[in-house]
From Swiss-Prot:
Its EC number is 3.6.4.-. It holds the Pfam family Rho_N. ATP binds at residues 188-193, 200-205, 231. The gene is rho. Signal peptide: none annotated. This is Transcription termination factor Rho.
Length: 438
């Protein structure tokens, strides 16, 4: 576990079923240091200005308990191999620290808790020789009373189907990225999509556009952005640009931390899908996640080209393969970036291994980006399997007629043609009608 992982402010709102007095850990995490000092002085904490921020929160909570208050904590459950678990805070990196709450094996068995469950409960402060808070009473699991989730299904037992409901990405007439994707590479609930991206082709901006389109058109969808091995400034930019929850493990952290964060995010998404929710995970990038797995996988003696161990890609494939539309209700959509043309043979091997696993591909082209055309979207190479289910017969026919016309053009001409026509229309319906008249 990495105790030096960066923390981020959480906008997560705690939902409880019983009123509990006092300050909550989640609230304290969001307060500026000046506010924490004000609270500490109010509670008569000795010399609060001498404490670091994390330690000051700890002192406030400890003092609150000694004065008869309660602590209510909501966190994501991470179960350890030995059977006990911890509730991690919504700080964007699930970093472990003194503010985490210990959950005993007996509580996990009694309430049939699973990795990724969001647990709300009353906790007590650490006793002598104890390092963590301890969970006393569970108030809610995944924001529901505990008795309501006892019969929930297991994710792996649910029936996967082809995506049959489109996620609309078009949200503004001038934002043509979502409009193009809606027609030429539509994304449905339960899609397993790859964004194939050479360096500097605008994949980060594309991810922001996807997030904006999803949150604008589908408030019922829970959006999670997972950034693996990214630069810290990219994480901050993403947090400020999108409305979904951003979880990250930056490049200065070890590969084990990348894997831990990714798997906990996936388990959280699965728990929501088990309850019939629609969840979208935007992953940047599947290539770096696979690299992390390759770094920690014990050598099997079978090494593929580029230094990839033959067994290293099984777990990232399981991550990507979790995306599915569920017959019983709910869906898990994963849209992941795959890096190509990086100069690394390992990245090429990873891409080839994932190439056939998705059911949708969004291809970005370096030669288009070099012309300063964004999005650098290769319309001719991008597409979605079974797009007839998502588009409907009438729209599909119009799109295929348009594709046939563009087959006579190169990729830059095709994109420029569509881009210019979309700029003249306010939505895709008007665009298709305009194309139909020509």
């Amino acid at each position: 576990m990495n105790e030096n992982a960066p923390t981020h402010k959480s906008s997560h709102k705690v939902k409880t079923h019983t009123p509990v007095s006092g300050y909550h850990i989640e609230d304290l995490r969001t307060y500026p240091t000046e506010k924490l000092l004000e609270i500490a002085n109010k509670l008569k904490v000795e010399n609060p200005q001498e404490f670091k921020r994390q330690d000051l929160m700890f002192e406030i909570l400890k003092t609150q308990v000694t004065q008869g208050g309660y602590i209510l904590f909501t966190g994501i459950l991470e179960i350890m191999p030995d059977g006990y678990g911890f509730l991690r805070g919504f700080d964007g990196s699930f970093s472990d620290g003194h503010n985490d709450t210990y959950v005993s094996p007996s509580q996990i068995r009694r309430f049939a808790l699973r990795n990724g469950d969001i647990v709300t409960g009353q906790v007590r402060s650490p006793k002598d020789q104890e390092k963590y808070y301890a969970l006393l009473k569970i108030e809610a699991i995944n924001y529901l009373p505990s008795d309501e989730i006892k019969n929930r299904p297991l994710f792996d037992n649910l029936t996967p189907l082809f995506p049959d409901e489109q996620i609309k990405l078009e949200y503004e007439p001038t934002k043509v990225t979502g409009r193009m994707l809606d027609l030429f590479s539509p994304v449905g609930k339960g899609q397993r999509a790859l964004i194939v991206a050479p360096p500097r082709t605008g994949k980060t901006e594309l991810m922001k556009e996807l997030a904006q389109g999803i949150t604008s058109n589908h408030p019922e969808v829970e959006l999670i952005i997972l950034l693996v091995d990214e630069r810290p400034e990219e994480v901050t930019d993403m947090q400020r640009s999108v409305k979904g929850q951003v979880f990250s493990s930056t490049f200065d952290l070890p590969a084990n931390n990348h894997i831990r964060i990714a798997e906990l995010v996936l388990e959280r998404a699965k728990r929501r899908v088990e309850m019939g929710k629609d969840v979208v995970v935007l992953l940047d990038s599947i290539t770096r996640l696979a690299r992390a797995y390759n770094a920690v996988t014990p050598s099997s003696g079978k090494v593929l080209s580029g230094g990839v161990d033959a067994n290293a890609l099984h777990r990232p494939k399981r991550f990507f393969g979790a995306a599915r539309n569920i017959e019983e209700g709910g869906s898990l959509t994963i849209i992941a970036t795959a890096l190509i043309e990086t100069g690394s043979r390992m990245d090429e091997v990873i891409f080839e291994e994932f190439k056939g696993t998705g059911n949708s591909e969004i291809v970005l082209a370096r030669n288009i980006a070099d012309r300063r055309i964004y999005p650098a979207f290769d319309i001719l190479k991008s597409g979605t399997r079974k797009d007839n289910i998502l588009l409907g017969k009438d729209r599909l026919t119009k799109v295929w007629v348009l594709r046939n016309v563009m087959q006579q053009m190169d990729d830059i001409e095709a994109l420029s043609f569509v881009y210019s026509k979309m700029q003249q229309t306010k939505d895709n319906e008007e665009f298709l009608n305009l194309m139909n008249e020509k």
